[in-house]
Amino acid sequence: MKKSIILSSVFIISAMITLNSCKKKTEVDDETQSVVDNAVCEQQFMAITPVVSEKGINQSGIKKINVGCGTWTILGAISGTNTPNVATDTLDSNADGFYDNGPVSFAIDYGTTGCLSFDGLSFKTGVIKLTTAKRWSVYNNPVTIDLQNYKVNNVTYSGQIIITRLDSVTVTTQVINGHCTDGNWNIDYEGTKTIKQVGGYSTPNNEADDVITITGNSSGKNRLGRTFTTNITTPLYKKSNCKWISSGTLELTPDGLKTRTVDFGSGTCDDDATFTVNGQTISFKLK
């Protein structure tokens, strides 16, 4: 009898182990928060570069102008003057005199009231501030971008961005200590990307038709505190008149979970995307 009880106990324990083992095998890794939060930060940080590039490269001389959504202003003084801000065209048509006094700062100011961007969905407030020791058109010259109370819809974006032009259509972008928050949740984001303008360069005064591709990698921490890393495997495609990345793929690895392949679609401007992990494909929204 005693031997029978022992055998029964062993059988029950073995059965429990087997059941638990089967249960673990059928668990689905469907964590989407890291994928969504990377997109929330990445899409807007990367969208800043073509806006800055459009204004910096194509600005003839120095003047304060409306830039569709926002106002472009130089924050500095021409050589030999004390003018703090330039509101009209100056005699220094090529702007070289501004750089005689050292680094020059510019601002794209969306104000506190804000305005609607070309995608029809992104409402912007705050300031994008640029600081550069040389003209924007100079290659291999790092330009520092600081975000001041910069908000898109209800999300505030902060951090520093270093942009370096490699050629007429290509820049590298490094996001340092990037942070995205709506006051209820917080996301950390850093990354180094190469951005190439593949559309809109023939219309220098029209931001609405700009199109860029993005390659590179990033890391961050999602709103639930889980860290993640990413690597773009097929260039991401972003139109300035679309809020979302519309095509391309990347690999994202949340801490403690399997690497998933994120697919942003085939080019349609929408917030639909998928990720595949362990052979299973899951749909999600880029919000």
What is each of the regions a protein language model found here?
Residues 24-287:
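Low-complexity, intrinsically disordered segments exposed to solvent
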